[in-house]
Design a protein with these regions (language model features):
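Long, charge-rich, low-complexity alpha-helical segments
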Residues: 1-40, 99, 104-155
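A general structural signal for short secondary-structure junctions and capping/turn motifs
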Residues: 11-12, 44-49, 83-85, 140
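Hydrophobic, aromatic-enriched interface-forming segments
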Residues: 26, 40, 46-58
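N-terminal start-of-chain detector that recognizes signal peptides
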Residues: 26-30, 46, 65-66, 86
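Short secondary-structure capping micro-motifs at structural edges
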Residues: 40-44, 78-81
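Low-complexity, glycine/alanine/valine/leucine- and proline-rich hydrophobic stretches
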Residues: 50-119
Length: 155
C-alpha cells in the first residue's frame, strides 16, 4: 500500500496543521458584556469575535472521526474504517479554548456561517450564507465552548 492510495491523508494533514497553527494563534480575551449588542442592534450591524485560530476544514472524508479515534479512542478504528470505505464527508471546526486547541464536527450549516464570518462579513450576511444553521442551538454552544468571544458594532 502506498500513501498516494490513501486519499484521505491530505485532509487529515490539513486538520492536524489547523490544530497546530491554532495553538500559536494570538490571544484574544472574551468580552461577555458585548453580547448585549445582540439585543439592541440588527445582525447586519454586528460582527462576532471568534476564538484564536478558528478555522474550518471541509473534507470528503471522516476527518473528525479519524482525529477523535486517534486522540480520544472513540469512535473505534473499525467504525472509522467503515466511514472511510463509505467516503463519509465531515466538516471540522477548530478553535482555541483558553490555551488549548480544540475541535469538533461542525453542526449543519455551521461551516458556512464560520466561513462567512472568517471572511469578514456581518453577522446578518453570515446568517444568510448559512440557512441550514439553527442559530438558537449554535450560539449558546459557541459561547459556552469559547468559540465566540464577543460581538462588536460595525462602524
Amino acid at each position: 500500500m502506498q500513501l498516494q492510495d490513501e486519499a484521505y491523508l491530505p485532509d487529515v494533514a490539513r486538520a492536524e496543521w489547523a490544530l497546530h497553527r491554532c495553538a500559536s494563534a494570538p490571544d484574544r480575551l472574551a468580552d461577555p458584556a458585548s453580547l448585549t449588542l445582540l439585543t439592541t442592534l440588527e445582525p447586519d450591524a454586528l460582527r462576532l469575535y471568534l476564538a484564536p485560530g478558528c478555522c474550518i476544514v471541509r473534507s470528503d472524508w471522516p476527518v473528525v472521526s479519524i482525529l477523535d479515534a486517534h486522540l480520544h479512542g472513540t469512535p473505534s478504528l473499525a467504525e472509522v474504517g467503515a466511514q472511510l470505505r463509505a467516503s463519509t464527508p465531515q466538516e471540522l471546526v477548530v478553535w482555541r479554548s483558553g490555551l488549548r486547541p480544540v475541535f469538533r464536527q461542525a453542526l449543519p450549516g455551521e461551516a458556512d456561517l464560520l466561513s462567512a464570518l472568517l471572511a469578514g462579513v456581518s453577522l446578518g450576511e453570515a446568517l444568510d450564507a448559512a440557512p441550514a444553521l439553527d442559530f438558537g442551538q449554535w450560539f449558546p454552544l459557541s459561547i459556552q465552548s469559547q468559540l465566540v468571544l464577543g460581538v462588536h458594532h460595525e462602524i
